[in-house]
Amino acid sequence: MKPIIAIVGRPNVGKSTLFNRLVGRRKAMVDDMPGVTRDRNYAEVNRFDVPFILVDTGGFEPETSDRLLQQMREQSRFAMDEADLILFIMDARGGLTPADRDVVDMLRRINKPVFYIINKVDGEKQEAEAGDFYSLGVDHIHTISAEHNRGVGDLMDEVLAAIPYDREKELDEEITRIAVVGRPNVGKSTLVNRLLGYERVVANPTAGTTRDAVDTRFTVNKKPYLLIDTAGIRRKGKTVQKVEKYSVMDALRSIERADVVLIVLNAEEGVTEQDSKIAGYAYEAGRGCIFVVNKWDTLAKDNSSIAKFTEEIRRNFKYLPFAPILFVSAETGQRTGKIIAEVDQVMEQYCKRVTTGELNRVFTQAVDENHAPLSAGRRVKFYFATQVAVKPPSFVVFTNCPEGIHFSYERYIMNRFREAFGFNGTPLKLIFRGRDKKDA
């Protein structure tokens, strides 16, 4: 297991700026609005051939009456429990605060390496003004400017020397990547917390509480997974704040990174146009898909309720007839235990390979039973089919008329492949290609 380094500190001291500086890309949102980084945000970093997991936390306020800040504080404490090494960030411009002193007192009681860092020290003037921080009585204080990369290299040299790492124990493991997507406040964060068994993501009734896409590694029956809890995707007209625009892009990037996408729907509201757009993103990206109908426990139901909602999904998502549907309650845990098992089944189909012999037996039978329509008066001939890729399963069909295959016939061939080989939960890619003369 890679060592874990947690970045903690009060809101708006520059934790996310340092996080992004070390990660080398804009993974955590950076904005002047206090509390922008609300959850623990994970990233894998490899610096000078030393790999580690970096954790960016929400702001740490030791004493606060604000509910969201209280939740962020608990997340920071959880991150410190997980971490092998802690970077505690303070703000040179804001000066030393009583809250800083309280956190330092708490960190002294933790039996882990702690680096005390004063951020926003852009030059000698700020260096001189940072003298108050030395009254904390800690062994060593590092002064940096994360924004301007001042002192960061020297800091990390010392950090890398201090973190525990055993290269022999580091495994190159295959991991199933799961993205959780949906409109704001359909219950994604509650679902993530239910799957993981603890409060990993701040779940709050306010729509849009989860702003960053937050990655979490976990294992089930010794099998590794990476869970990506995306920020809710809003309709374009409602994406007013700059920070919310970041979240939409982050959610789309999360879909691109995933193998399997959990499309979370709100049972109370039914299927909306925005749900269709979100599912369309996953389909167009060629990802395995599972519909998760959340808040199912809140509905008054009869014996036909599941059938009716299933029909509504199939009617609105005609391009995803292969996606399994699960009806769950993240709040109570009802049926959530089935999700990972379903992910495993979809992942198996997403990676499935079919031999050329088996494929052409099914393909030839399908063509014999239903010939392709003429193309501009020309008879369409097929030669053979072969699988060329997985994730998703992709096939090339060689023909004399690659431009003349109607989409309905393409759908017919894919349906026959599904009947024969399954491919439940995964899209298929079918490419028609002309045969080279040398192959004729």
Curated annotation (Swiss-Prot):
Domain KH-like: from-to ranges: 352-436
UniProt-listed CDD domains: EngA1, EngA2
Keywords assigned: GTP-binding, Nucleotide-binding, Repeat, Ribosome biogenesis
InterPro entries reported in the protein's UniProt record: G_ENGA, GTP-bd, GTPase_Der, KH_dom-like, KH_dom-like_a/b, P-loop_NTPase, Small_GTP-bd
Amino acids binding GTP 1: 9-16, 56-60, 119-122
Alphabetical list of Pfam families matching this protein: KH_dom-like, MMR_HSR1
GO function terms (MF aspect): GTP binding; ribosome binding
Binding site residues for GTP 2: 182-189, 229-233, 294-297
Matching SUPFAM superfamilies: P-loop containing nucleoside triphosphate hydrolases
Biological process per Gene Ontology, one example term: ribosome biogenesis
Keyword Glycosyltransferase: no
HAMAP family (UniProt xref): GTPase_Der
Subunit structure as annotated in this protein's UniProt entry: Associates with the 50S ribosomal subunit.
Family: Belongs to the TRAFAC class TrmE-Era-EngA-EngB-Septin-like GTPase superfamily. EngA (Der) GTPase family.
Biological function: GTPase that plays an essential role in the late steps of ribosome biogenesis.
Name of this protein: GTPase Der
Organism of this sequence: Citrifermentans bemidjiense (strain ATCC BAA-1014 / DSM 16622 / JCM 12645 / Bem) (Geobacter bemidjiensis)
